[in-house]
C-alpha cells in the first residue's frame, strides 16, 4: 500500500480531553477532509439479518464512542505510529435499507466498492454478519479476484438458508463460496465452538474448503502455533479479515446478539492479530456488536481496540 505523505493526525488526548472533540473513530479526520487516504473506517449499521437478539445496527456508533478511550499515537507491540505512516480517516456510514435485505446488500456493495476505488483498504464496523457478502464482493473487485478469508467467529456462518431466507447472518460464507469470493485453499475459521444443528454443518463447511481452528485449540496449541497455522494458510494472498465479536467469550463481550460461552479472551484475540503482522491485508470487518446488551462499554471497547489493532496491521502490510 502506498502511504500518504503527510497524514492528518487524530485529535490528541493531550490537547483535547478524550471525552470531547470529534465523534469519529479515534477522533480521526473525516474522509472528506483529507486529500488522499490509505485506510478508511466505515460504518455499516445494518442488522436485518439477525436471527436472535437484534441491535447490531447501533454497533458502529458505539464502537466509535468507545474508541475515545484509546491512546492511539504509538503501538509498542508493532513499534509503529499507525496514523503517522498512513492516512486513516472515518468515512461515516453506508446508508442501507433496513426493510429490504436484497436492496441493502446492493447498497452496501456499491458503497464499499466506491470507497475502495478511493482508498487503499477499508475497515467496516457492523452491523450483523450479513454485511460480509457485499463487502467481500467489493474486496474482490479491488483485488481483481478472490481473496484469502480468515473468519474469527464462534459460528461457522455457512448455513444454506434460515426459514427459507438466503441472507441471514448465519449464511454469508455459503453465499460467498457460491460466488467464488474467497480462495478455498487459503481460507479458514478461527474460534469456532459450541453445539451445531447437525453434524452435516461441519461436513458442508469442509466441502467449501475451510480449515477450522476450534477455540479449544488455543489452550492445547497456544498462540504461536495458531498464528503459524493462519500465516501458512494465507501465504502471500490478499487477505480479508472478518471478525465477529462473539468469537470472544461473553465475559469479555456480552454485548452481542448470539453469545457462546467458552470463547477467546481479549488477550488471545489481540495477540493473534499482532502475530499476523506482515500479511497482505486489504480489507476487514468487525461485526455483531449490539450495545443494548453490553455493560460499561466493555464489548464496544473490545471492538474498538480490535479496529485499532487492524489499523496497525495495515501500517505493517
Feature names for model-found ranges:
Residues 2-317:
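Conserved alpha-helical scaffold segments that buttress catalytic/binding sites
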Amino acid at each position: 500500500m502506498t502511504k500518504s505523505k503527510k497524514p492528518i493526525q487524530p485529535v490528541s488526548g493531550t490537547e483535547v480531553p478524550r471525552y470531547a472533540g470529534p465523534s469519529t473513530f479515534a477522533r480521526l479526520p473525516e474522509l472528506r477532509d483529507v486529500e488522499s487516504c490509505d485506510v478508511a473506517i466505515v460504518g455499516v449499521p445494518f442488522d436485518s439479518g439477525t436471527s436472535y437478539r437484534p441491535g447490531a445496527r447501533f454497533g458502529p456508533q458505539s464502537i466509535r464512542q468507545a474508541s475515545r478511550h484509546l491512546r492511539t499515537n504509538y503501538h509498542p507491540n508493532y513499534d509503529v505510529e499507525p496514523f503517522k505512516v498512513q492516512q486513516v480517516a472515518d468515512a461515516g456510514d453506508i446508508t442501507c435499507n433496513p426493510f429490504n435485505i436484497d436492496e441493502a446488500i446492493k447498497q452496501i456493495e456499491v458503497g464499499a466498492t466506491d470507497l475502495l476505488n478511493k482508498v487503499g483498504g477499508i475497515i467496516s464496523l457492523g452491523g450483523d454478519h450479513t454485511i460480509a457478502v457485499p463487502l467481500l464482493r467489493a474486496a474482490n473487485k479491488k483485488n481483481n479476484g478472490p481473496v484469502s478469508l480468515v473468519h474469527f467467529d464462534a459460528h461457522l456462518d455457512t448455513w444454506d438458508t434460515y426459514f427459507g431466507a438466503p441472507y441471514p447472518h448465519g449464511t454469508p460464507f455459503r453465499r460467498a463460496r457460491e460466488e467464488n469470493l474467497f480462495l478455498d485453499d487459503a481460507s479458514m475459521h478461527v474460534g469456532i465452538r459450541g453445539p451445531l444443528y447437525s453434524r452435516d454443518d461441519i461436513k458442508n463447511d469442509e466441502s467449501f474448503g475451510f480449515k477450522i481452528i476450534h477455540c479449544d485449540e488455543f489452550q492445547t496449541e497456544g498462540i504461536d502455533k495458531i498464528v503459524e497455522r493462519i500465516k501458512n494458510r494465507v501465504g502471500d494472498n490478499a487477505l480479508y479479515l472478518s471478525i465477529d465479536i462473539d468469537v470472544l467469550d461473553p465475559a469479555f463481550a456480552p454485548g452481542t446478539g448470539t453469545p457462546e460461552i467458552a470463547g477467546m479472551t481479549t488477550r488471545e484475540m489481540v495477540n493473534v492479530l499482532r502475530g499476523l503482522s506482515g500479511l497482505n491485508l486489504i480489507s476487514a470487518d468487525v461485526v455483531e456488536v449490539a450495545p443494548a446488551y453490553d455493560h460499561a462499554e466493555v464489548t464496544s471497547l473490545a471492538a474498538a481496540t480490535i479496529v485499532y489493532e487492524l489499523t496497525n496491521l495495515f501500517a505493517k502490510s
